[in-house]
Amino acid sequence: MLLRNLVAEFLGTAMLLATVVGSGILLHKIDAGNVAVTVIGIAFATGCVLYALIQMLGSLSAHFNPVVTLVNALQRNIRWISVAPYIAAQVLGAMAGVILANLMFDGSPISISTTERHGTGQLLGEFIATFGLIGVIFGTSRNKPDAVPQSVSLYVAGAILFTSSTCFANPAVTISRMLTSTICGIRPTDVPAYIGIQLMGGLTALLFFSWLYNANAKDSQSATAAPGDTDLPKTLKAPHAFVLPDDYNIHEQERELTGAK
């Protein structure tokens, strides 16, 4: 089961990055110098394909993002022993997607980017983008789990347009986009700051929305509970798109990772 989850993460992240970079390359050829046209097209293509990928692979695993994986581990939705394999699959998949996009448009498989992405404004944009992404996943998975694919894909499409950084919001995306010298690239020296601010945004979102929804649950419970009943309702799990399926044997996962029988 773990192997299939990792393959799903690899495939989904690869297709996501092929979409981002491929659409960027194509649209930049026809935008006549108007970069806004390219960004709008990337947002539309990314939102559409991300929705399809979550629907396609959600029954297995559809994090496609190390920050989402780390947040799930911190919430104890997945074992920490799974985190490294998940992140490795996501990063390798993202790199494969970028390479495929380069090749589709007759470029070199790998061409290191020189596109500068730095400064307070862009880092703030990345913090906001990642904070919002985790918030959308966290809140929608509790209020309307079936709407997570729509909510996440719409948010990402919108965040590409409204943030100064064009919403990387994903360390695997950031690392892989070093490998394309196109409009979608990022200079290697700018990558550490992007990843650091993404992790900060994700962790801040986890703390904030955990407080927000726990406080809401406590208020609701206090209004309806019998005197002396102080137990809070259990936190709802996120839908299968962002956590392991409910019937997954976590001990089987550990055996697969360690090679034990």
Which role fits each region the language model picked out?
Residues 1-261:
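Membrane-interface helix-loop junctions and terminal tails of multi-pass membrane proteins
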